[in-house]
Amino acid sequence: MRPIWSPIWSEGSRRVSLSRRSTVVSEVVPVISDPCRIHVIGVGGAGMSAIAEVLASMGHTVTGSDLKASAGLDRLSALGVDVTVGHDARNVAGADLVTRSTAVPDRNPEYMAAAESGVPVVSRAGILAAICAERDAIAVAGTHGKTTTTSMLALVLREAGLKPSFIIGGDVNEIGTGAAWDTGRLFVVEADESDGSFLLLPRRYGVVTNLEPDHLEHHGGFGELRNAFLRFVSETDGPVLVGVDDEGGRALAAEADTLSIGADPCSDWQIQNLEESWEGVRFSLRGPDGGTLPVELPQPGAHNARNAAVAAAVGVMAGADPEAVSQALARFGGVARRFEQRGRTAGVVFVDDYAHLPTEVAATIRAAGSGTWNRLVAVFQPHRYSRTQKLWRGFSGAFDGADILYVTDVYPAGERPRTGVSGRLIVDAVRDAHPDQDIRYVVRREELVVQLADELEAGDLCLTMGAGDLTSVPDEVRALLEAGDRG
């Protein structure tokens, strides 16, 4: 099939060059073109284990350590990475380079040993920047949809035969991993704006899915966050595609030199004729020359349509055959914790989602509402005290469409409690806006599981949402329901 558009991003684009010291933060970014010995402190987390996997695939000798055993360590060990449970200064012996998770403190014995012996130590962002410098990186940034969009794009490029490398914040179901190092020129990476380190990544191409207030505890305010994204756009070597279906994205695209994508007819890439159902979405994507690409996605929600549109546009611009793009998206099975169907027990369907910001929650509720359920029972766990303190009022209308809402206490994510900040803030916000809303505040996890098992009925959808540890609740509730059936 003849491509609908000629690629805007040419096959012969140059590789990104990178100075050894970033102009964004005062951190030396190593050059890792030649094989060396790299030790990873805190290798068990999803982000660092993905990096370790890629480093090993690049030909480096990789070792790593973490405080406790995990499935992630087992996977790395199977890939040939020498992993150790526990931190010990001896683990860094012989290392040419050390990198550490953001959760690893300066008092860590391995970090201290490396620093004292003169072995270079870089952050997660620093080692990720070094990896990006080895390929033409496509950095996917934005407030919402980064992981899903990055996953879709990796699948699209892979199915089109472009053999991309990638590091994603979750495992892609069709690929079975969230990290790979292949022989193609493209490297797809999820760019995290939470601490500003996304500006450290050298990138040939950029994506901003959308822009809303988040991570203000680091940036200080939305104006500062917006300025960081303006830098992200201006410091990207090649084209940047920006979603313009939200106010922040529209303002960014209007001020910066970008390509735009969205439902707006003035967008360079326009989403047309969107149809939604519980089974998924379908739409047409009009390109800059007026040609259209049909897209069907087996994931519900207008937000997923926007994610798919971005992946399709970037895929075509990167040289993927449009027909291969459509075929890849038509079989996209999702990412862990992104509207992930967790099974059916006693006639109740369970879905788990990572949504933790007001607009994400609202979009997930809307997507769930497209099904034919007797009731939509939503369960929400607020994430971080700092985020809850700043955003709790924004949740007042986020749960519209839920028949019953359970709210738990805040998942701290390493933060210390703050006076007056708890899940009750969100409960109060919802009750003030919707006095008739059936909302229940349950602090203790064990009580939540029991209450859900007692409340749920055949024909209900149980939707758990949050970025913390609520993800295991569906399994716990299902176990109780199954025990009840057997009894």
For each of these PLM feature ranges, what is it?
Residues L186-S194, F350-A355:
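Switch II (G3) loop of P-loop NTPases
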Residues T63-G64, L162-I168:
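Conserved RecA-like helicase motor-core motifs
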Residues V40, I138-V140:
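Hydrophobic anchor at the beta1->P-loop junction of P-loop NTPases
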